[in-house]
C-alpha cells in the first residue's frame, strides 16, 4: 500500500531496543545466550504488536471481517505458494543466523557481546538498502503484471546504480565511525568489546554493495512471481556463509575474523 516508513521506524526501534536489552542482559547481568534470546524475543514482540495495532487503527481494509465470506475468484493457491516460499526463505535465514551465533558464542563472552551489539548496528546500517529492495520488488511486480517490461528494464538499470552508490556511502561512514558507533552502546572502559565490534563493522561495512545487490535480486524474483529463485539464492548465500565461517575460524591465525569475513563472501 506504499507505506514503507512505518515498518522502517518500527524495525529501527526494535533494533535499538534489542541493543539496549542485549547490553543489560548479556554485558551487565551476565545472562549469556539466554539473555540475548530474551532481548531478541522482547524487542521483536514489541515491534510486532506495535505494527499490528497501527494496522488495525490506520488500515480498515486490512481488518478481519467475518460478515462476507466468499472463495469465488480467490487466489488462495497463489497466496499459499508465494507465502510458503517466503516463509521457508525466512526460516533458512534464521537457521543460518543461529548457526553463526552458536559459533560466535564459542569464542567467549567478549566476542559474543561485541557481536550482539555490532550486528544490530550492522542491521540498521543496511536497513535502507533492504527497504529499497522491498520498494524495488513492488515496482517490478506492478509493471510485470501490467506487462510493461521496458519500465522493468529501466528500473533494474537505475536501481542497481542507486543502491550501489548509497551502499558505498554507508560503507565509508561505518568504516570511519565504527568505534563511535560501538561507543554509543558500550562504555569506554570495555575497550576489548569495542575493538572486536569495530572489527566486525569495518569488515561487514566494506561490502555493503554486495548485500544491496542481493536485496535487489530477492526483490526482482519476488516481483516476477519467482519466489523460489529468491529461496535458492538464500540457501546458497547462507550455505556459503556458514561453511566458510566454520572452516576459516578453525585456523588459529584467523580466529573470529574468519566468521566476520565469511559473511560478506556469502553475500
Regions picked out by a protein language model, each given a short descriptive name:
Residues 1-7, 11, 114-172, 176-178, ...:
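Small-residue-rich hydrophobic transmembrane alpha-helices
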Residues 3, 13, 25, 32, ...:
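Hydrophobic/aromatic residues within transmembrane alpha-helices of membrane transport systems
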Amino acid at each position: 500500500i506504499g507505506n514503507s516508513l512505518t515498518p522502517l521506524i518500527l524495525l529501527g526501534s526494535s533494533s535499538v531496543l534489542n541493543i539496549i536489552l542485549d547490553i543489560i542482559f548479556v554485558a551487565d547481568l551476565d545472562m549469556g545466550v539466554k539473555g540475548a534470546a530474551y532481548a531478541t524475543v522482547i524487542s521483536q514482540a514489541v515491534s510486532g504488536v506495535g505494527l499490528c495495532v497501527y494496522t488495525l487503527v490506520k488500515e480498515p481494509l486490512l481488518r478481519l471481517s467475518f460478515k462476507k465470506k466468499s472463495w469465488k475468484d480467490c487466489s488462495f493457491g497463489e497466496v499459499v505458494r508465494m507465502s510458503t516460499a517466503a516463509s521457508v526463505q525466512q526460516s533458512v535465514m534464521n537457521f543460518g543466523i543461529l548457526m553463526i551465533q552458536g559459533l560466535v558464542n564459542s569464542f567467549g563472552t567478549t566476542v559474543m557481546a561485541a557481536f550482539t551489539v555490532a550486528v544490530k548496528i550492522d542491521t540498521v546500517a543496511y536497513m535502507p538498502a533492504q527497504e529499497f529492495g522491498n520498494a524495488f520488488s513492488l515496482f517490478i511486480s506492478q509493471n510485470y503484471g501490467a506487462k510493461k517490461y521496458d519500465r522493468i528494464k529501466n528500473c533494474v538499470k537505475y536501481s542497481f546504480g542507486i543502491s550501489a552508490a548509497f551502499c558505498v556511502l554507508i560503507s565509508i561512514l561505518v568504516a570511519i565511525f565504527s568505534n563511535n558507533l560501538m561507543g554509543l552502546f558500550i562504555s569506554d572502559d570495555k575497550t576489548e568489546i569495542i575493538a572486536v565490534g569495530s572489527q566486525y563493522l569495518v569488515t561487514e561495512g566494506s561490502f555493503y554493495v554486495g548485500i544491496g545487490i542481493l536485496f535487489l535480486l530477492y526483490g526482482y524474483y519476488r516481483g516476477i512471481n519467482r519466489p523460489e529463485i529468491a529461496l535458492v539464492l538464500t540457501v546458497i548465500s547462507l550455505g556459503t556463509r556458514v561453511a566458510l565461517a566454520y572452516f576459516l575460524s578453525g585456523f588459529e591465525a584467523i580466529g573470529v575474523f574468519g566468521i566476520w569475513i565469511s559473511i560478506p563472501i556469502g553475500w
